[in-house]
């Protein structure tokens, strides 16, 4: 089983940034998104995970900039952020990206989400942003600020609709460099036949090696963000470790 790494480029106000736990106002800027994405391409990435944070938080869009980034990359792009109706989905797919991630829309408009995962197949993945609470495994919606229901109920519904891929984030881990929630990922993999991509918390090459051991269980890859930008390891080191 191969294990794919997707270095992240999160874009806010035209700049590549990183957030802590997805919270608006915690951005650290890393400069030009195209330069960031090209750097990952040069380092050997086969995929880039590109996020429009302004669209995700409902405060505008960087779509033209992101379309330009996609056009100038040779690697495959997974595009995320603010895709919640036919117009935004079609605009995202028109950038030439390989696939898009639905977030909030899959929770707040389930009929629409069920239709598009069936219609677009591999070109649509669903992001499941999980907050583990005393009430159980809850999904976080709309830029992680509202409750989106029970993880297992939503997963069963999307599976029944034919969803082809899930991107799973433990919100408490994202941007914290505290290590991924391996138990959560293992449980999600056990409950769906669709491939799963991990997101959030990766702090070291060892974390990625641990995740890659779940490839046989259905964990297809991991998004890597802050650890790369913080210099904890290079993408080349990470790719070598999981090959």
Curated annotation (Swiss-Prot):
GO terms for cellular component: cytoplasm. GO terms for molecular function: 1-(5-phosphoribosyl)-5-[(5-phosphoribosylamino)methylideneamino]imidazole-4-carboxamide isomerase activity; phosphoribosylanthranilate isomerase activity. Gene3D superfamilies: Aldolase class I. Keywords: Amino-acid biosynthesis, Cytoplasm, Histidine biosynthesis, Isomerase. GO terms for biological process: L-histidine biosynthetic process; L-tryptophan biosynthetic process. Its EC number is 5.3.1.16. It is found in: Cytoplasm. It is an enzyme of class 5 (isomerase). Its main location: cytoplasm. It comes from the Bacteria. Pathway: Amino-acid biosynthesis; L-histidine biosynthesis; L-histidine from 5-phospho-alpha-D-ribose 1-diphosphate: step 4/9. It catalyses: 1-(5-phospho-beta-D-ribosyl)-5-[(5-phospho-beta-D-ribosylamino)methylideneamino]imidazole-4-carboxamide = 5-[(5-phospho-1-deoxy-D-ribulos-1-ylimino)methylamino]-1-(5-phospho-beta-D-ribosyl)imidazole-4-carboxamide. The keyword Amino-acid biosynthesis applies. The active site is at 10 (proton acceptor), 129 (proton donor). HAMAP family: HisA. This is 1-(5-phosphoribosyl)-5-[(5-phosphoribosylamino)methylideneamino] imidazole-4-carboxamide isomerase.
């Amino acid at each position: 089983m191969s294990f794919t790494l997707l270095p992240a480029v999160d874009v806010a106000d035209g700049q590549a940034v990183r957030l802590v736990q997805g919270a608006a106002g915690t951005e650290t800027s890393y400069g030009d998104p195209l330069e960031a994405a090209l750097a990952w391409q040069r380092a050997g990435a086969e995929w880039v995970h590109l996020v429009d944070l302004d669209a995700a938080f409902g405060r505008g869009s960087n779509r033209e900039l992101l379309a330009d980034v996609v056009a100038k990359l040779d690697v495959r792009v997974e595009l995320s952020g603010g895709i919640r109706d036919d117009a935004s989905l079609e605009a995202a797919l028109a950038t030439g990206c390989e696939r898009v991630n639905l977030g909030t829309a899959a929770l707040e408009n389930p009929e629409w989400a069920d239709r598009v995962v069936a219609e677009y197949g591999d070109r649509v993945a669903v992001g499941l942003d999980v907050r583990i609470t005393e009430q159980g495994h809850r999904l976080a919606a709309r830029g992680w600020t509202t409750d989106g229901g029970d993880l297992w109920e939503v997963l069963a519904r999307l599976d029944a609709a034919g969803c082809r891929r899930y991107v799973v984030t433990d919100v408490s881990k994202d941007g914290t460099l505290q290590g991924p929630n391996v138990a959560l990922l293992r449980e999600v993999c056990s409950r769906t036949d669709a491939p799963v991509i991990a997101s959030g918390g990766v702090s070291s090459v060892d974390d990625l090696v641990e995740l890659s051991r779940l490839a046989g269980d259905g964990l297809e890859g991991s998004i890597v963000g802050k650890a790369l930008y913080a210099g904890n390891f290079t993408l080349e080191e990470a790719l070598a470790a999981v090959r």
